[in-house]
C-alpha cells in the first residue's frame, strides 16, 4: 500500500516495514532480537528455527525495495546480549545498507556492540519535516514516525467473533509502526476521529474504514 505524507511517498508492507521512496530508506520498528533466545533460556518451548525467521523476513523485504539505508525505530535488541546477537552480527555482514538505530527503552546493551557493526545510534532523527523517534512524540510542524506501542486493531465480525490484526496506526501528525519481531504481541488501539488504520494481513496492507 502506498501513502503520501507531506508530499513524500511511503510503501507500507505487510511485514510491518515502510519504504520511503524519495529517500530510499527502509523504516522498521521493534524487532526485539534476543527475545526468543531469552524465552528459550527460561524454558519456553519455542523452536530454535524461529530465531532465523526475523532475518529471513528482513531479507525478503530488502529484496523488494531499493533501500540504501535502514532505520530501526527502537527496540532492536530486547535486553541482555545472547546468541541472537551473533546471528544479527552475521546478517549485517551480508547486506550493503547503511544502518541507523533510534534508541528505544529496550536498547540497553553497550553501544560498543553497535559501533563494532558500524551502526549509528541517535535518540531521535529529523529528516526534512519528519521526526523519527521510538516513543510516540508530538512536535509542532513535524510528522512523527514511531514505534513502541505495537499497535493492533480488533475488527468485529458476526455475533461475538473478532479478528485481531497488527496495524500501522495513523494520527493526523503521526504514524505508529507495528512490531516487526516475532512473539512481541499487540496493544489494541481504539481509533478516534481523524485516525486512520492500515491493517496487516498475510498478503497485503489494507485501510480499514472506521465509519
Predicted regions mapped to residue ranges:
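Extended recognition/assembly regions associated with phosphoester-bond processing machinery
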Residues: 1-73, 78-211
Amino acid at each position: 500500500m502506498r501513502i503520501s505524507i507531506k508530499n513524500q511517498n511511503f510503501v507500507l508492507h505487510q511485514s510491518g516495514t515502510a519504504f520511503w521512496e524519495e529517500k530510499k530508506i527502509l523504516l522498521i520498528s521493534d524487532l526485539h532480537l534476543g527475545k526468543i533466545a531469552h524465552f528459550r533460556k527460561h524454558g519456553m518451548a519455542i523452536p530454535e528455527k524461529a530465531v532465523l525467521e526475523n532475518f529471513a523476513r528482513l531479507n525478503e523485504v530488502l529484496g523488494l525495495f531499493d533501500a540504501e539505508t535502514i532505520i530501526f525505530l527502537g527496540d532492536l535488541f530486547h535486553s541482555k546480549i545472547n546468541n541472537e546477537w551473533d546471528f544479527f552480527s552475521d546478517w549485517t555482514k551480508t547486506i550493503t545498507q547503511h544502518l541507523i538505530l533510534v534508541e528505544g527503552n529496550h536498547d540497553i546493551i553497550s553501544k560498543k556492540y553497535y559501533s563494532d557493526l558500524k551502526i549509528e545510534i541517535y535518540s531521535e532523527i529529523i529528516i526534512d519535516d519528519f521526526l523519527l523517534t521510538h516513543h510516540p512524540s508530538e512536535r509542532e510542524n513535524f510528522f512523527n514516525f514511531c514505534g513502541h506501542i505495537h499497535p493492533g486493531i480488533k475488527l468485529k465480525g458476526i455475533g461475538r467473533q473478532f479478528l485481531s490484526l497488527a496495524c500501522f496506526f495513523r494520527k493526523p501528525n503521526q504514524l505508529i509502526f507495528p512490531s516487526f519481531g516475532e512473539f512481541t504481541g499487540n496493544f489494541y488501539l481504539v481509533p478516534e476521529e481523524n485516525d486512520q488504520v492500515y491493517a496487516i494481513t498475510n498478503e497485503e496492507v489494507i485501510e480499514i474504514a472506521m465509519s
